[in-house]
Amino acid sequence: MSRVCDVTGLAKSFGNKVSHSNRKTKRSYLVNLHNVTLVSEVLGRKFKMKVAARTLRTINYKGGFDLYLLNTASRKLSDEAQKIKRKIRAAIASGKSLQCGVL
């Protein structure tokens, strides 16, 4: 099972554990993933995803899943999130609007 955030693509990273005597030992940092259901109000759909806790905090701060995707640069999003973002933009262009928030 892959430990990668489905929204941002955040994955396991590597670094050094540094002891008191300043010895450096390789170690890895895992992503704090949670299985969540994110709701798109524009599309009227739910998406089951594995999302990092850091990304969840950012989604709440930005005002919801739709606003987070629309206000985040595409290069910072995973391929799956970019597809959802395109669907949201198409829905808005065809006449649907965000119920809670300003673009």
UniProtKB/Swiss-Prot annotation:
The keyword Ribonucleoprotein applies. GO terms for cellular component: ribonucleoprotein complex; ribosome. The keyword Ribonucleoprotein applies. InterPro entries: Ribosomal_bL28 (IPR026569), Ribosomal_bL28/bL31-like_sf (IPR034704), Ribosomal_bL28_bact-type (IPR001383), Ribosomal_bL28_sf (IPR037147). One of its GO terms (molecular function) is structural constituent of ribosome. One of its GO terms (biological process) is translation. Pfam families: Ribosomal_L28. It comes from the Bacteria. Keywords: Ribonucleoprotein, Ribosomal protein. Transmembrane segments: none annotated. NCBIfam families: L28 (TIGR00009). Belongs to the bacterial ribosomal protein bL28 family. This is Large ribosomal subunit protein bL28. It comes from Anaplasma marginale (strain St. Maries). The gene is rpmB.
